[in-house]
From Swiss-Prot:
Transmembrane segments: none annotated. Residues 848-866, 878-888 have a biased composition (Basic residues). NCBIfam families: topA_bact (TIGR01051). Mg(2+) binds at E8, D95. It catalyses: ATP-independent breakage of single-stranded DNA, followed by passage and rejoining. It comes from Synechocystis sp. (strain ATCC 27184 / PCC 6803 / Kazusa). This is DNA topoisomerase 1. Residues 2-126 form the Toprim domain. Monomer.
Length: 898
């Protein structure tokens, strides 16, 4: 007999296995083993006629959730049940947060072990931590389970109640979510502010001066004793000067005249000032600050940051990555201070060990901050990590070490200079002692380079000095609208407002991008027309559900449930039932919402009407007695739609496409058109005989008005054959694809090898030599998988059989068939002969068409002890007809659970 330890993932299982005695068997649940039904297909036959069946929550019987085992988890559950037969003790070692507690609880309810059960928790996977956790097991925390379950039910109630309303009133397949919709509204509000923003222009002067051959710069501050205007002096809604501002506003002509008046006049230093100051290091990372800094420094999305951090945690490199605590254990503080002393010297160590306190709204679970694992921190270049894993680990290491370093000491320098009636100011900064800057500068990837950039050197100057003015320049400025949210700034705002939980931000941002509410534009989150329509409807009819304050108070209630301060059932009843509950609100407003109004979007500074149609957004404008409509290209957002763009779309609709010229070889006309996916060139007209003329999209950044005949001919000739690869003898071509221009090497049976073009590369002019350089570079991104090992060719089709490393461990791949390595096999021991039967078994199992019923448990409201299964929920028998369309996006916002 053995002791069965259950964790979430195979990677975590492999790492933990190294630290446990021989008689411990570690298995993975692969995440949650039960959940609410994801679709009508998963609802068991016994419940399909219930009015609440599609909701998956029996609101008539104490909000009893209907839990099912997803089809993808049935094999896992069966394997765990088999492993349980040989166990004399079960240890549930899932993560130490609400989701982890919930997974353990579900495993307990599902497996119903007859042997002793323990709950083991840890926040890092090291030998010391695992052994300590093993000696300090506890029971399942029912309050944490209630909090997770309440959050899950809330997300389902909001998603499944509001989403169908959006389908009826705006467009099929839309979704609403408890946190998702608030995030979308923030992004839409920012875009509205940008559209309403009125730009104001103003000018100032910049002087290049010299003292004892040492150059420095100064900026005009006052004229005739009155302060010069800057951007903060203007009203963002009108562009006019704010009424209480007593400032001088220069236009271009006045700035030029002032420059000419001051040129050649003597300058004098009238005041100097030095202000000493300190810069303190930032606290170690929480989930949200890690996401923000990884996005700023490394350009990694919140979703990818969490994926990489999860891997680092499961492999024992960092502590648990879902936390809002900035606290460090005494051992961690000691480890960080040892690193400082060894690498930078004692003078860079803070005089006393530093501890930090969490200031974010609603901070909860008592984890540590994210830091390198263990009592001795591994130096990044000695970990053996590569690529993103190394970059993220190094970021965490630097931040943790820096938090125990001495403050940086700086001096702010200010020199006031006068010429005629104008006063200029030269500002400088001197770093007297770099302190923690030596290891970490927030927002910078290179501390040494950042250190140089931090300093602004001024020559020694004193009152009465007369520096030489070498040049005066006029500088024009325009006030800027508020910046669009990036992933980093949205995460920061969500956390500061107390909306959602840091552990859910990555999935929320991923969801709003995947659902088409937001597009990424140069790291900025740009809302789509659909986002505007949905937010307008929710603001008008369900304002609480998109209000940050209301959503923040919901989070506080969930936190209170987690510590037993608030009862979960009364809270759910108050939210959903009764006259003011969500269920009744939706019923009442369903008849009040006019689809024609819901589909219309009002945009600042735009006379044309924008509407959401069956095939996407379009513009509508009256022209005499007619109403002209024109589709809006899919990649065009409200940010891009202005009166000029509207005129272009309407002109194309009424007058037909612009003609670039005649193709020199075919004699056919070449047109430029704008379609649902943006502008493209077309060879010839679409006729009955030629229904699909040759078309090619314009490369990103190329405007329709900039297209020449030569460029159009080149685009229509794509793909270009560049020549043969010197090693394979196969063709290399250049072309345009969904993700932009690329080159491709056709390797025959080995598939096609793609590389994106870079920088100044032009798909129309790239040479074979340059293509070979690109192909020689290692692949990047999602499709860049290089086999760990090539096992050989499959005897049936001579296609390669390879080993790859995926998120759940090493697997075998042949064509489209993937097979996991069986227990006991490793990358070194697996052979082609062993792989073939595994692939055959996997391929055979994929051909089965019989479908088993979903295993279900309808959970009641009473929970006795953690070892007992929950009661089966019952409900009054009613029949509700529902139409299910497979293509609709699921309204469930399970990704928001956290």
């Amino acid at each position: 007999m053995s002791k069965l330890v259950i964790v979430e993932s195979p990677t975590k299982a492999r790492t933990i296995r190294n630290y446990l005695p021989q008689d411990y068997r570690v298995e993975a649940s692969m995440g949650h083993v039960r959940d609410l039904p994801a679709s009508a297909e998963e609802v068991p036959a016994a419940y399909k006629d219930k009015s609440w069946a599609n909701l998956g929550v029996n609101v008539e019987d104490h909000f009893s959730p209907l839990y099912v085992i997803p089809k993808s988890k049935k094999k896992v559950v069966k394997e765990l049940q088999t492993a349980l037969k040989n166990a004399d003790e079960v240890i549930l070692a899932t993560d130490e947060d609400r989701e982890g507690e919930s997974i353990s609880w579900h495993l307990l309810q599902l497996l119903q072990p007859k042997v002793p059960i323990k709950r083991m928790v840890f926040h890092e996977i090291t030998q010391e931590a695992i052994r300590s956790a093993l000696e300090n097991c506890r029971d399942i925390d029912e309050n944490l389970v209630h909090a997770q379950e309440t959050r899950r039910i809330l997300d389902r109630l909001v998603g499944y109640t509001l989403s169908p309303l959006l389908w009826k009133k705006i467009a099929w397949g839309l979704s609403a979510g408890r946190v998702q919709s608030v995030a979308v509204r923030l992004i839409v509000q920012r875009e509205r502010a940008r559209r309403a923003f009125k730009t104001a222009g103003y000018w100032d002067l910049k002087a290049e001066l010299e003292q004892n051959k040492n150059p420095f710069q100064a900026k005009l501050m006052t004229l005739g004793g009155t302060k010069l205007a800057n951007g903060s002096d203007f009203d963002p809604n009108t562009g006019a000067l704010l009424p209480d501002k007593q400032v001088v506003v220069l236009d271009e002509a006045q700035a030029i005249a002032l420059k000419e008046r001051l040129t050649g006049k003597p300058w004098a230093v009238v005041n100097t000032e030095e202000k000493p100051g300190v810069r303190k290091p930032s606290p170690p990372f929480t989930t949200s600050t890690l996401q923000q800094e990884a996005n700023r420094k490394l350009g990694i999305s919140a979703r990818d940051t969490m994926r990489v951090a999860q891997k680092l945690y499961e492999e024992g490199y960092i502590t648990y990555m879902r936390t809002d605590s900035v606290h460090l254990s005494d051992q961690a503080v000691t480890a960080a201070r040892n690193c400082v002393q060894q690498m930078y010297g004692k003078e860079y160590l803070s005089p006393q060990p530093k501890q930090y306190t969490t200031k974010s709204k609603g901070a909860q679970e008592a984890h540590e901050a994210i830091r390198p694992a263990g009592t001795e921190f591994r130096i990044p270049n000695q970990t053996g990590l590569k690529d993103r894993e190394l970059a993220l680990y190094e970021l965490i290491w630097k931040r943790t070490v820096a938090c125990q370093m001495a403050d940086a000491r700086i001096t702010q320098l200010s020199v006031l200079l006068k010429v005629e009636d104008a006063e200029f100011r030269a500002a400088g900064k001197r770093i007297d002692f770099p302190g923690y800057f030596r290891a970490y500068v927030e927002g910078s990837d290179d501390p040494d380079a950042a250190l140089e950039n931090q300093e602004v050197i001024l020559p020694p100057l004193k009152v009465g000095d007369r520096p030489n003015c070498r040049e005066i320049d006029t500088v024009g400025h325009e006030t800027q609208p508020p910046a669009r949210y990036t992933e980093a700034s949205l995460v920061k705002t969500l956390e500061s407002e107390g909306v959602g939980r840091p552990s859910t931000y990555a999935s929320i941002i991923g969801t709003i991008i995947d659902r088409g509410y937001v597009q990424m534009r140069s790291k900025a989150l740009t809302p789509t027309f659909t986002a505007f329509a949905v937010v307008s409807l929710l603001e008008s009819h369900f304002p609480d559900l998109v209000d940050t304050g209301f959503t923040s108070r919901m989070e506080q209630k969930l936190d209170e449930i987690a510590i037993g301060k608030t009862q979960w059932l009364p809270y759910l009843q108050g939210f959903f039932l009764g006259e003011s509950g969500l269920e009744n609100q939706v019923k009442v407003r369903q008849d009040q919402i006019d689809p024609a109004i819901a589909k219309a979007i009002e945009l600042e500074n735009l006379a044309a009407k924008v509407k959401i149609g069956k095939f996407g957004p379009y513009i509508e404008i009256p022209q005499g007695e007619e109403i002209i409509t024109a589709s809006i290209p899919q990649d065009l957002t409200p940010a891009d739609l202005n009166p000029e763009q509207v005129a272009v779309l309407l002109k194309q609709k009424t007058e037909g496409p612009d003609k670039v010229g005649i193709h020199p070889e075919t004699g056919e006309p070449i047109f430029i058109l704008i379609g649902a996916y943006g502008p493209y060139v077309q060879l010839g007209e679409a006729t009955e005989e030629n229904k699909k003329p040759k078309r090619t999209s314009l490369p990103k950044g190329v405007k329709p008005e900039d297209v020449t005949l030569e460029m159009a001919v080149g685009l229509l000739a794509l793909p270009r054959n560049l020549g043969e690869h010197p090693e394979s003898g196969k063709n290399i071509k250049a072309s345009l694809g969904r993700f932009g221009p690329y080159v491709v090497h056709d390797q025959g049976k080995d598939g096609k090898d793609y590389r994106s073009l870079k920088g100044d590369d032009d798909v129309l002019t790239i040479t074979l030599e340059r293509a070979l350089e690109l192909l020689a570079e290692p692949k990047r991104g999602r499709g860049s998988r290089t086999p760990l090992k090539q096992l050989g060719l499959h005897p049936e089709d001579q296609e390669p059989v390879n080993l790859f490393k995926g998120p759940y461990g090493v697997y075998i791949k042949h064509g489209k068939v993937n097979a996991s390595l069986p227990e006991g096999e490793t990358e070194e021991t697996i052979t082609l002969e062993k792989a073939l039967p595994l692939l055959a078994e996997k391929a055979g199992s994929g051909k089965k068409t019989s479908r088993k019923k979903a295993t279900t448990t309808a959970k009641g409201t009473k929970k006795t002890t953690s070892k007992k299964a929950s009661a089966t929920g019952t409900a009054k028998k009613t029949t509700t007809k529902r139409t299910t369309r497979k293509k609709a996006a699921s309204p469930d916002q399970s990704s928001e659970a956290g």
